[in-house]
């Protein structure tokens, strides 16, 4: 709670930026996304507005991306919210000025989507998947993640 309190206090100040549109993405689109980011270290963040640990983690990820962007890190957010909650998800990422690519999962079959991302992943949120410059998944972080451990893992592949 201590880590998220400053962000909660600043929410009214942050809510004035432009709305970040969430592009739809399915399992085939995710693979194309990974392929298009080859040459960069990318952290894919799967989250949802109803997931309390996700909401706490998102502003920390935005700060981490700001810190490591010059070294080549890009954070891509993918909301697992239902389509009818797209506006709420867009508003949430707007509050934290998430300026990287942002998507909304739109798969006809959640199990197929989850399996395409990582066959070992249960679909639990939050979920972070770290890819190296060759487009290979090198680490997975499922559930609440220690930001120091995450940063250390990212620095190893930058």
Question: What spans do the regions from the language model cover?
Answer:
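Conserved redox-active cysteine motifs that mediate thiol-disulfide chemistry
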Residues: 46-63
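Short pre-active-site segment immediately N-terminal to redox-active cysteine/selenocysteine motifs
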Residues: 40-42, 46-50, 82, 124
């Amino acid at each position: 709670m201590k880590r998220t309190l400053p962000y909660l206090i600043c929410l009214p100040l942050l809510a004035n930026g432009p709305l970040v549109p969430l592009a739809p993405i399915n399992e085939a689109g995710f693979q194309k996304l990974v392929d298009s980011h080859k040459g960069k270290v990318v952290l894919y963040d799967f989250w949802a507005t109803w997931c309390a640990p996700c909401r706490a983690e998102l502003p920390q990820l935005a700060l981490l991306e700001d810190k490591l962007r010059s070294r080549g890190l890009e954070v891509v957010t993918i909301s697992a919210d239902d389509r009818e909650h797209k506006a709420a998800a867009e508003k949430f990422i707007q509050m934290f000025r998430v300026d990287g690519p942002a998507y909304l999962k739109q798969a006809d079959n959640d199990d197929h989507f989850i399996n395409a991302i990582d066959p070992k992943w249960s679909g639990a949120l939050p979920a972070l998947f770290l890819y190296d410059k060759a487009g290979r998944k090198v680490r997975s972080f499922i559930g609440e993640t220690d930001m120091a451990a995450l940063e250390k893992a990212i620095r190893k592949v930058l």
